[in-house]
Each structure stands twice: as C-alpha cells, then as structure tokens.
Amino acid sequence: MAGILDRKVALVTGGASGIGRATALAMAREGARVAVADRTEENAAGTVALINAAGGQAIAIGGDVTMEADVAAMVARTVAAYGRIDCAFNNAGVAGGSVGPGRQRLHELSQASFDAMLAINLRGVFLCLKHEIAHMLAQGGGAIVNTASIAGLIGLATSSHYVAAKHGVVGLTKSAAIEYAQDGIRVNCVNPGYVTTPMTEEVVQTRLDAVMAKVPMNRMGHPDEIAEAVVWMCSDKASFMTGASQVVDGGYYAA
C-alpha cells in the first residue's frame, strides 16, 4: 500500500540527527524522496545512508541556514535532483543553552548570544520559507512545517533569546499561512516539548527531575513521536490545516 507521501519530494533541514533525522526517515517510509540538509554534506550523509539502506531515495546537502545563498542552493539542489519540492520541514536550529555560556537571565545575555540565537532559529526559518515558497508558487502549491517549540507559546525563565526566536517562528508561520493560503501552500509549525535528542540531552539532563515534574506523562518525548506529526501535516490528509501550531509535548502546555 502506498504511503501518505508517496511520489512526493521533501526537503528537511537539520536532518543529521534528532527530530530532523527521525522525520526524514519517516518521510521516506511513507514514500517521499528526501533531500536531507545539514551544516555539512558529511553530517547529512548518515541519515541518507539509513534511508537508502531501507530502500528509499535520498540525497545529502550541506549548507548554513543563516546564509541566504546557502538556502537558495539547498532548494535549487533539491529541485535539480527531483524536479520539485512538495513538502519542506524547516527544522535546523539550536537549543537555548547552545549559544553563549548557558542559562542566563535576560540582563546577563550578551548581544552576540541573542543575535546568534535569532540568526539560526528565526532568520534560518525565514530564509527557508522565502526560497521554498518562491518555488512552490511556481509549481502550484506545497506544504511547509516549521519547528517551533512550546517555548514559542509560553515564557521560560533564563531562555529569553530562545523564547523570542521560537515566538517569532510561530508568528512567521501564521503570517505565511495567511499570505499563501489561496496559492495552494499550507504552512504550519510543530511545537515539541522536551524530547530526547543530542541537542537537548546536555541541557535537560542537568535538571531532569524539575523538567519531568512539569510533564503530565512524566517522560521525555521521542523524535519519532514528533516526526509522525510532521509527516501527517505535510501530507494531503492535513489539506484543511494551515497556520496551526501543533503541540506535541506530553501534556506540558496543558498543565
């Protein structure tokens, strides 16, 4: 039986590990040909090897999502390889403690840390949207999912730069959804809670008990659980869904 992304072409940024890798693999299992992008082609190659070994089709692309020329090249290489882009998962990003010295109150944050966070987590999404949408307009439609966070819906202490960036992703998602709804382009975002990935492991493990106390399911999420939501939003089964923030967080946001 054909998968829900059968014959579609997907572009996944931040595809070397974590949620990005899990989603690229899930898309391939559902029949998509996948362009896996990460900072270097070598980083992306591991995910591509897993897809190809399972009988799927994928290519590796290297590039920095903070650089417009790199993003334009990612889109161009995907189209050159597969002819189109039906769905895109703009997932490249960093955790709150990955830029600068770690958890800091707002008055302690340097401008450099703030700017670096927004460059990766917000400007990167903007640039991907810009170039993906331009191509999708020419081909007559498509579906895009951006990685936001529960931090895009609430405030979190000592993470103001991360929270600002993720709120920005939610805002970009809603605005783009409205602008392009009549062009056949759907734009949504996924808002994960605490998920076990290489990016979050160091940040969360230092305060695991405190984090779990806020999650009604009392566990971390798995990248595959986020991937399933993203795949569905990219598929035609979500044809009436745009501008949405899909929370996948074990109940954190509801508590």
Give the predicted meaning of each segment.
Residues 3-35:
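Canonical Rossmann dinucleotide-binding motif of NAD(H)/NADP(H)-dependent dehydrogenases/reductases
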Residues 154, 197, 214, 231, ...:
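Short C-terminal tail/terminal secondary-structure segment
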Residues 134, 178-182, 239:
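Alpha-helical segment proximal to the catalytic Tyr-Lys
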Residues 129, 165, 173:
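Active-site helix of classical SDR
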Residues 215-226, 237:
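A conserved structural motif in NAD(P)-dependent oxidoreductases
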Residues 99-106, 110-115, 211:
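Substrate-binding pocket helix/loop in short-chain dehydrogenase/reductase
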Residues 149:
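Residue(s) in the substrate-gating loop at a strand-loop-helix junction
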